[in-house]
A protein has these predicted regions:
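N-terminal metal-binding scaffold of metallo-dependent hydrolase/deaminase domains
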Residues: 1-42, 320
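Divalent metal-coordination and catalytic microenvironments
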Residues: 9, 25, 32, 50, ...
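Alpha-helical scaffold segments that flank or form the walls of functional sites
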Residues: 26, 52-53, 70-141
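Active-site gating loops and adjacent loop-to-helix segments of metal-dependent hydrolytic enzymes
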Residues: 67-102, 192, 202-217, 240, ...
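Short, well-structured alpha-helical segments that form the helix of a local strand-helix-strand
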Residues: 104, 300-314, 324, 328
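Active-site core of metal-dependent hydrolases
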Residues: 151-157, 161-276
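C-terminal cap of metal-dependent C-N hydrolases
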Residues: 316, 326-369
Length: 369
């Protein structure tokens, strides 16, 4: 077994993100897994003592193709910009049709550069859109691009074809399909991710979209929930919810009840949503989430829960072998230690300051000699 050892100033370890200082990590080059985590520094270890290691982040909801045409329609409401093939987004898909794959790829590479190693992507444009996503992420090492496709015009034959190329289905809203179509999607994608936007706007919430989704589509992943109430959260304790607070603020659709969701035991994940209006930086997303939760419940501190939502919780939902513990894939993100080591609360510091402290990310495929 060929292995390397690294010495770290600190790290967030295991499922509970336990913070431990002055450790060494040994990893198997061939298997790309962590084989041992020890206390103190190893005399043969590569010197990374000026860094704190955190596990890779997961961006659990994006529309990456939008990144091709940033800041279009800043004077237009959400309903005019996204959604069905008559929206501004689709008009720009046509204008930039030869640039979409490049735009997606840039989004993914920029994400990886700040320690986000999995991006869950709602891909529009049907089967063609999923194929563009596959093409865009080809060759990006140590990276997961989870593609949730959808059909702009429903066809059971195309639905089955989509099933063969996508990781799951990304439903724009309950109003996108008829009840029989929702049931067909559920049946065809019975063993894959079934994601759906829910109650992003007050209009959809007042139409009882959550109840209808649960009844007919039976989602395995919900997106936004901006206008859900505390009582609604009790209905979705078994369904992970991805919140995108920066997007909700930009589109003026409301502010997600983050503190209530955490206290009600909802499995919270985090996403950056539309790349045209919100950048790929998930670190900003979790910082905003923390600030919102504290405004909703003064003097609260949900930093650790929020950081878990961008890491550990997402690993479980998407079945990722990530995390800094033995037998997990060797994939870590390095943050500059100097500012963090003085922090009186390491989790709050990482959530609020991590965006500026990411130095680089390490995988077993890299040569650390």
């Amino acid at each position: 077994m060929e292995s390397y050892k690294i010495n770290l100033g600190g790290a967030l370890l295991g499922e509970d993100l336990e913070y431990r200082e002055e450790i060494n990590i040994e990893y198997d080059i061939e298997k790309e897994t962590i084989t041992h985590i020890g206390k103190g520094f190893d005399k043969d270890g590569i010197d990374l003592r000026n860094f704190i290691a955190v596990p890779p982040l997961v961006n659990s909801h994006t529309h990456t193709a939008d990144f091709t045409f940033p800041e279009i329609g800043v004077d237009k409401p959400l309903k005019d910009l996204v959604g069905d093939p008559k929206s501004e987004k689709y008009r720009y898909f046509e204008i930039y049709q030869n640039k979409i794959s490049e735009g997606i790829r840039n989004f993914l590479i920029n994400s990886k550069n700040i320690g986000v190693f999995t991006v869950v992507d709602f891909r529009e444009q049907g089967i063609k859109g999923v194929k563009l996503g596959i093409e865009a992420s080809s060759g990006i090492r140590d990276f997961n691009h989870i593609l949730l496709g959808r059909l702009d015009t429903f066809s059971i034959d195309e639905l089955r074809e989509l099933y063969n190329s996508a990781h799951g289905y990304g439903l724009p809203s309950i109003s996108s399909n008829s009840i029989p179509e929702l049931i067909d999607i559920r049946r065809v994608f019975s063993d894959k991710i079934r994601a759906a936007h829910v109650s992003e706007t007050k209009k959809h919430y007042l139409r009882h979209d959550l109840e209808q989704l649960i009844s007919y589509y039976k989602p395995t992943l919900l997106i936004h929930g901006t206008n859900l109430s505390k009582n609604d959260f009790s209905l979705i304790r078994e369904i992970p919810l991805v919140i995108c607070p920066r997007s909700n603020l930009w589109f003026s659709v409301g502010i997600p009840k983050i503190a209530d969701a955490i206290e009600e035991g909802v499995e919270l994940l985090f996403g950056t949503d539309n790349g045209a209006w919100i950048d790929y930086n998930l670190w900003k997303e979790i910082e905003v989430a923390l600030l919102i939760s504290r405004s909703q419940k003064p003097l609260s501190n949900f930093a650790k829960q929020i950081l878990k939502g961008a890491t550990i919780t997402a690993y479980k939902v998407f079945k990722l072998n990530y995390g800094i513990e033995e037998s997990r894939k060797f994939l870590i993100v390095l943050l500059k230690k100097e500012e963090l080591v003085r922090a009186h609360d390491i989790y709050t510091a990482i959530v609020k300051r991590g965006s500026n402290l990411v130095t680089y990310s390490l995988g077993a495929t890299q040569n650390l000699k």
